[in-house]
Amino acid sequence: MHDDTVDRTTNGTGKVKDKTLAEIKQLRLKDKDGQLTEHAVPTLEEALLAAKGQIMVNLDKAYPIFDDVYIILRKTDTADLVIMKGAQPVETVKREFGSYLDKVIYMPVVTIDEEKSMKVVEDYMEQLHPVAFELCYRNVASPVPAQMERRLAGKSLIWYNTLWASLAGGHDDEAARKDPDASYGYLINKLGARILQTDSPAFMLDYLRSKGWHD
């Protein structure tokens, strides 16, 4: 479950921690517009098996339970399709999960408005060489995103989250509806983004295909 309660995402009410798995499995999921669907709430294992061989899965709220998640990844043989992520320094991540970091895809999340952000990236590059970094920034005038593009070019992929303006310097899904070149195009061409997290996948795909950037 994404939330602490089941109210927003299902036809139930109450806190997740107060319910049994059997009770949660009786609930039906809502779609992104809040409309009820025929789908029940899956367990993580069920969701991973459904995704296996089809898509990658971004577990963005799993950091506190990575050890439990890793057991399920091994059971389902899905470690290669799950992105495990967190905002902690590399020393903390290695101390807590070092026994299996080489067996999973771990992506650091770095808020590059912070002064220490370049050091955080440098430490990760030196010690873990992540396949990608999720970079977040609010300050539209910040020079750091361009610096990050130069530092990571050819070494690690850059991921930006376009769900909200505060995560990508104003270059979000809403802005893209008015001017996709100034939003998605800017992140790709100017800041080196190769992965974009969006709530508007169909719109984004149409844009990317119009530019010849997607099959």
Segment roles from a protein language model:
Residues 2-112, 127-140, 154, 164:
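Metal-dependent phosphodiesterase/phospholipase catalytic core, i.e.
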Residues 34-38, 115-215:
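C-terminal active-site rim and adjoining tail of enzyme catalytic domains
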